[in-house]
């Protein structure tokens, strides 16, 4: 059934006022088998709408190669929401932020020297239009005007915190309209003068993003002539980055009070209702005084936990919705997905990463090249060279390198440099003797591209310039791209993992029946874990996250296979537990 949706003095659906109480669920952070469970729990809390971003890089990981299947099937997610009686807000903006790798932008954009992002640079816009030619026709039939559940779509995301290119915003608006988007278009920005002013574009409705003081925020928006009032992102929690000292939590009662006030004053989208998990290597990062990569979990201290459990915040939000709307939440039969501890996994084989990588195709160059120039976006890049003369290694500098580099001489780590340590030369406390024929390997990890701030364009990964040994540049490098696919295809044999070098470990465990579980890695250092070929995500002893979430659909009844890349030359026990540990 087709509907009309209009923004006037309020939101009107088929001529009747609609009070939007929405919650964010990112389809790309939840296994498809659990979409129904999460959406039903959203409805049962009293929400009438679900909101999601659409990350460009998740759907076009390589230029011109699109994927809208499985976990990427946004159309199926939207249709399921409709079948369950929910309206939908879509945010198909080129940039999403969202604590997601590169804010959703594809890293292959950075292969073009000098390209400017999120502006009217014709090189950037050409790629956006190619993407829209594929994406937007998929979304058009999902609009309420075509019988779907989509009420509105977003043009750009928090652009007022980034730039002021009005021509760019107008181009995005027009591109969506020309491709058939006829529901209202929106933007979302912080409710501050510069942000609202820079993010504004004619013919597009403005919304605000904030986590508290709704009365003051909305009053300011009213002064700027914005009506009706909507908070597109009510931040009810926050995200974690490695080493931040503990899982970010907000007081449930005070958060519920803020939420109740917000419902009284206008329309709201809860960010996040359910955070989910940044599976794979898709976590983003912030970079202020130092790089701060996000952890694998995107629990966000949301009303619904990472594994879909109802929290105190959920119950308080539900009560607030019922009290403010005067209607009880829909009666929805909810299930609690079982958890199970499967015990200790058994290691079956291990091998040095350098040995396993030796047979891979490599690119040869005079000087090192960045991941992006090598056609790689995520993972690790290995730079290998043979030293030609005898000398003493006193000083080493990796020029234009990011994010974390492990320097190995003949297979043994002699130096690890991270983030700001890569900005200058490193002087060895004890000089390292080098002989002709010695092999120098440098393994560089992309720990997550920054997803917010002006630094978006300035973050090629790997080594993008030179390696300076003592006081001279070293030339002649073989470069191997070790992305998720390449690493997960490696098969360790035997049990030969040196104590001071990256290695891959194979393990197995038995699951008599499938249930949610949590992977604990006591004694391990840093790396990535795969389960039955699926990338669960990163681990790091720095915390705060101590266990990785494993949804039941990823398990097999019977034997399950784990592959662990451990970059610190460590090993320990591996346990499958029935409780999370986010720190």
Stretches found by the model and what they are:
Residues 20-32, 56-74, 110-130, 154-165, ...:
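The substrate-binding groove and active-site-proximal loops of carbohydrate-active enzymes
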Residues 1-49, 79:
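N-terminal carbohydrate-binding accessory modules
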Residues 35-101, 173-178:
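Aromatic-lined substrate-binding rim segments of carbohydrate-active enzymes
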Residues 74-90, 113-150:
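An active-site-proximal structural segment forming one wall of the substrate-binding cleft
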Residues 124-201:
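Active-site neighborhood of glycoside hydrolase catalytic domains
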Residues 393-408, 509-532, 539-540, 562-565:
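Aromatic-lined ligand-binding clefts that engage carbohydrates, nucleic acids, or primary amines
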Residues 86, 178-179, 209-305, 309-312, ...:
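Catalytic-core region of carbohydrate-active enzymes that cleave or remodel glycosidic bonds
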Residues 64-70, 94-118, 169, 173, ...:
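Aromatic- and acidic-residue-enriched segments that line the glycan-binding/catalytic groove
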């Amino acid at each position: 059934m087709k509907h009309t949706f209009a923004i006037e003095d309020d939101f009107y659906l088929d001529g009747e006022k609609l009070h939007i109480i929405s919650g964010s669920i990112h389809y790309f952070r939840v296994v498809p088998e659990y979409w129904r469970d999460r959406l039903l729990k959203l409805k049962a809390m009293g929400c009438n709408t679900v909101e999601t971003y659409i990350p460009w890089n998740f759907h076009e990981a390589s230029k011109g190669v699109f994927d809208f299947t499985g976990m990427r099937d946004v159309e199926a997610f939207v249709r399921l929401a409709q079948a369950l009686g929910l309206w939908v807000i879509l945010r198909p903006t080129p940039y999403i932020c969202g604590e997601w790798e590169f804010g959703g932008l594809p890293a292959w954009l950075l292969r073009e020297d000098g390209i400017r992002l999120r502006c009217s640079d014709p090189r950037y816009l050409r790629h956006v239009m190619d993407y829209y030619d594929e994406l937007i026709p998929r979304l058009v039939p999902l609009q309420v005007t075509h019988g779907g559940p989509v009420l509105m779509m977003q043009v750009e995301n928090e652009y007022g915190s980034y730039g002021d290119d009005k021509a760019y915003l107008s181009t995005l608006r027009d591109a969506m309209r020309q491709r058939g988007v006829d529901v209202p278009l929106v933007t979302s920005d912080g409710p501050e003068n510069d942000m609202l002013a820079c993010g504004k574009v004619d013919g597009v409705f403005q919304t605000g993003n904030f986590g508290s003081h709704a009365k003051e925020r909305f009053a300011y928006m009213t002064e700027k002539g914005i009506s009706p009032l909507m908070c597109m992102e009510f931040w009810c929690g926050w995200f974690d980055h490695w080493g931040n000292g503990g899982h970010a939590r907000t007081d449930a009662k005070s958060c519920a009070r803020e939420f109740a006030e917000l419902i009284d004053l206008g329309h709201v989208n809860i960010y996040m209702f359910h955070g989910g998990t940044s599976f794979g290597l898709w976590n983003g990062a912030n970079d202020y005084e130092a790089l701060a990569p996000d952890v694998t979990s995107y629990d966000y201290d949301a009303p619904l936990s990472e594994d879909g459990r109802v929290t105190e915040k959920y119950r308080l939000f539900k009560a607030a919705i019922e009290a403010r709307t005067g209607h009880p939440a829909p009666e929805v039969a909810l299930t609690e997905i079982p958890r199970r501890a499967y015990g200790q996994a058994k290691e079956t084989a291990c091998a040095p990463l350098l040995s396993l990588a030796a047979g891979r195709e490599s690119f040869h160059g005079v000087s090192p090249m960045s991941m992006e120039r090598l056609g790689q976006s995520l993972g690790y890049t290995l730079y290998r060279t043979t030293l030609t003369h005898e000398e003493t290694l006193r000083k080493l500098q990796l020029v234009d390198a990011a994010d974390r580099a492990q320097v190995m001489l003949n297979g043994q780590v002699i130096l690890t440099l991270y983030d700001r340590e890569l900005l200058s030369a490193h002087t060895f406390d004890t000089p390292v003797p080098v002989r002709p024929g010695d092999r120098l390997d440098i393994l560089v990890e992309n720990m997550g591209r920054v997803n917010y701030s002006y630094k978006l364009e300035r973050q090629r990964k790997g080594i993008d310039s030179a390696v300076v040994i003592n006081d001279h540049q070293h030339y002649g490098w073989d470069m191997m791209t070790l992305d998720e696919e390449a690493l997960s295809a490696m098969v360790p044999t035997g049990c030969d993992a040196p104590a001071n070098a990256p290695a891959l470990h194979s393990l197995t465990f038995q699951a008599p029946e499938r249930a949610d579980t949590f992977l604990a890695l006591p004694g391990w250092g840093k790396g990535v874990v795969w389960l039955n070929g699926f990338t669960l995500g990163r681990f790091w002893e720095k915390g705060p996250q101590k266990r990785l979430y494993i949804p039941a659909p990823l398990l097999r009844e019977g034997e399950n296979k784990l592959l662990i890349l451990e970059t610190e030359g460590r090993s320990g026990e591996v346990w499958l537990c029935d409780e999370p540990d986010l720190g």
